[in-house]
């Protein structure tokens, strides 16, 4: 199997069993700020609950797209797992300013409730046609 070369990869954790708003950002982890202009920001803290969900952005330089449309970056956005509650991942995505319509694919790692329960709420927020493929 040959994997294509990519130019950038970012992973935004939407649900991972844990949250700590007091941790500062670092070179490898950019966290939402708690304060702006010495004032606490009003959004609620992220929902912390059992389960997992991550938004994965993969960007690659696509020379064919560059020749045809003048664009040089092809980005795919994947939602990997959907959390354990109806609205936990939705709430965290909204807090982080994530638009569900930007998602190209949803991947469920396995059939445990803490990885798929949020899927119906997420699909309701995607305003474009989508296809669901289930293994036989």
Predicted regions and their residues:
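Zn-dependent metallo-beta-lactamase
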Residues: 1-74
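Structural motif
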Residues: 9-12, 76-78, 105, 130-131
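Active-site metal-binding loops of divalent metal-dependent hydrolases
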Residues: 15-17, 82-84, 111
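Pre-active-site segment of Zn-dependent metallo-hydrolases
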Residues: 45-47, 58-61, 66-105
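Glycine-centered flexibility sites
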Residues: 51, 83, 117-118
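Active-site metal-binding motif and surrounding structural segment of the metallo-beta-lactamase
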Residues: 87-133
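Metallo-beta-lactamase
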Residues: 136
């Amino acid at each position: 199997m040959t994997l294509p070369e990519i130019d950038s990869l970012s992973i935004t954790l939407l649900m991972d069993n844990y949250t700590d708003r007091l941790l500062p950002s670092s070179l490898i982890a950019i966290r939402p700020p708690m304060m702006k202009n010495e004032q606490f920001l009003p959004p609620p803290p992220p929902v912390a609950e059992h389960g997992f969900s991550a938004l994965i952005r993969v960007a690659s330089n696509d020379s064919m797209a560059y020749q045809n449309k003048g664009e040089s970056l092809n980005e795919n956005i994947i939602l990997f797992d959907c959390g354990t509650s109806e609205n936990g991942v939705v709430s965290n995505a909204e807090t982080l300013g994530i638009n569900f319509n930007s998602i190209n694919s949803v991947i469920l790692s396995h059939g445990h409730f803490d990885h798929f329960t949020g899927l119906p709420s997420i699909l309701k927020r995607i305003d474009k046609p989508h296809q669901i493929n289930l293994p036989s």
